[in-house]
Amino acid sequence: ILMYLADKFGKFIPSDENRVDTLQWLMWQMSSVGPVFGQAHHFLYYNPGKSEYSELRFKKITNKIYKILNNQLDKYKFVSGGKKGNYTIADMAIWPWIARHKRHQVNLNDYPSVYRWYKEIYSRPAVQKGYHVPHFEEEIPL
């Protein structure tokens, strides 16, 4: 859906050589961030103490993913877009998972570039508006 909307409206996805980079990071979110963080939430947040092996496994993999993201954000303002530093659909797909960092027992201070990026995206009015929906308001954790 993100790809379709970005292409249809010509926003949040590069049309130059950085397009492939954006799509690679989007696919990384779908193949790594989402599945692993989902499992981390299951074992660490919703069912703690039920499987020590699973808790340790997904905490370890979660931290590896944070390191990869932090290394990328050491070099660029946003996840993709190269040196232009544009906010893209890759950021949109990854950020909500990072917003739940407490559920997978991650301290964003341990990943300073991720934390900087997290706050940058949090400051966007559209992001705040999306999280403050009537009758389903959830605080964005900082």
Q: PLM features: what roles do these ranges have?
A:
Residues 1-63:
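GST-like domain detector, emphasizing the conserved glutathione-binding G-site
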Residues 2, 59-70, 115-118:
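Hydrophobic core segments within long, regular secondary-structure runs in both alpha-
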Residues 9-11, 63-78:
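Short amphipathic alpha-helical segments and their helix-coil junctions
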Residues 27-28, 58, 97, 117, ...:
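Tryptophan-centric aromatic hotspots in well-structured domains and transmembrane helices
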Residues 30, 34, 66-71, 122:
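Structural signal for well-ordered, non-membrane alpha-helices
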Residues 32, 36-41, 79-110, 115, ...:
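GST superfamily/GST-like fold recognition
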Residues 71-83, 125-130:
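Surface-exposed helix-capping loop/turn segments at secondary-structure junctions
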Residues 127-142:
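Terminal-tail/helix-coil boundary detector
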